[in-house]
């Protein structure tokens, strides 16, 4: 039982956290820079957009390095995981014979499959670790084993796993369109809680390919957690805690949640209330997969929401909706619930004090 728990923690906590590091450093920042470059135009804008595309295409490598770094792997395993991740990311292209042109040039269309990159990198790292430092030919053996094992599994398993997760994501997207109230609650609450837990909601949103109102509900849930904790814990943590949680991460509250689970209730109830409201009727908040699990962290969720919604709505209206549903209402609703629970004695001063 302990062995199973260790493997699950390895994959879903450390592994996905490492995957998120890679995603932030390539796909997510590349998407933001691409938008800025396109808005700038001209020579400098063109260069910036080109830099962004390079970053996006290296998503698989970033994931491989991020996972290996999180596992504290040796140098050769860490660097070789980049190649394994790239093979896994573009496994479908490799199988289809479209990865190389007739002249032998590498053709990288899009960022590839993030989950395929994770699977290939994880297997390559796990097997590469077994031989790292064990032979006098470590310089050759470890990179070769890491790349070959990860790449092979990436080709064999990656496309199938990615297809299943895409199917599951499409099911969530479709279900949210059909039943926005029920699914709005479910998606908003689950993604918000995942964001606060030591699991990467950003990686989950991208793996599932959330989009449209499903991604909109997911973003609301994440915003409620971050802004909710930032506001409700202000008395305990002041301005520093406000920014650390509001544009950093609500994961900082995990030690306190473990001791006092009731402090998690205000932002979670806010997610359940605002998630469906924000995606129905005239509000129709949407987002893309990249921003769906980011909340207000680095304002990535807001940038992606703007990019997604401005195509069909006026910029001023989109910004107004973002301010109201991503900041004002999550903070206000969480605070109202928090005050009620505090007055009833369920939450007390000092229970949300951060130790950092």
Q: What positions do the PLM features span?
A:
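Pore-lining transmembrane helices
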Residues: 1-356
């Amino acid at each position: 039982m302990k062995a199973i728990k260790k493997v699950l923690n390895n994959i879903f906590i450390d592994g996905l956290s490492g995957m998120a590091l890679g995603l932030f450093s390539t796909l997510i920042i590349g998407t933001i820079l691409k938008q800025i470059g396109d808005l700038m135009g001209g020579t400098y804008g063109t260069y910036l957009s080109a830099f962004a595309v390079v970053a996006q295409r290296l998503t698989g490598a970033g994931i491989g390095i991020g996972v290996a770094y999180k596992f504290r792997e040796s140098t050769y395993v860490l660097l070789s995981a980049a190649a394994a991740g790239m093979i896994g990311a573009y496994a479908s292209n490799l199988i289809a014979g479209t990865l190389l042109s007739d002249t032998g040039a590498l053709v990288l269309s899009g960022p590839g499959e993030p989950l395929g990159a994770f699977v290939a990198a994880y297997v390559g790292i796990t097997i590469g670790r077994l031989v790292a430092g064990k032979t006098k030919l470590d310089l050759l053996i470890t990179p070769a084993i890491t790349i070959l094992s990860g790449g092979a599994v990436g080709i064999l398993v990656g496309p199938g796993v990615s297809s299943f997760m895409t199917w599951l994501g499409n099911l969530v997207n479709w279900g949210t369109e059909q039943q926005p109230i029920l699914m709005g609650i479910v998606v908003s609450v689950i993604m918000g809680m995942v964001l606060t837990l030591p699991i990467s909601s950003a990686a989950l949103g991208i793996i599932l390919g959330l989009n449209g109102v499903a991604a909109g509900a997911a973003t609301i849930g994440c915003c409620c957690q971050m802004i909710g904790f930032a506001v409700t814990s202000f008395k305990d943590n002041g301005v520093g805690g406000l920014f650390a949680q509001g544009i950093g991460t609500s994961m900082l509250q995990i030690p306190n949640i473990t001791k006092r689970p009731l402090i998690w209730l205000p932002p979670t109830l806010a997610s359940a209330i605002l998630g469906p409201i924000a995606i129905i009727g005239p509000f129709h908040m949407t987002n893309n997969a990249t921003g769906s699990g980011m909340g207000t962290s680095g304002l990535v969720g807001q940038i992606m929401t703007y990019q997604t919604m401005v195509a069909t709505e006026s910029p001023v209206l989109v910004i107004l909706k973002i301010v109201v549903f991503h900041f004002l209402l999550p903070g206000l609703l969480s605070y109202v619930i928090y005050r009620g629970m505090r007055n009833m004695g369920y939450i007390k001063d000092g229970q949300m004090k951060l130790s950092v």
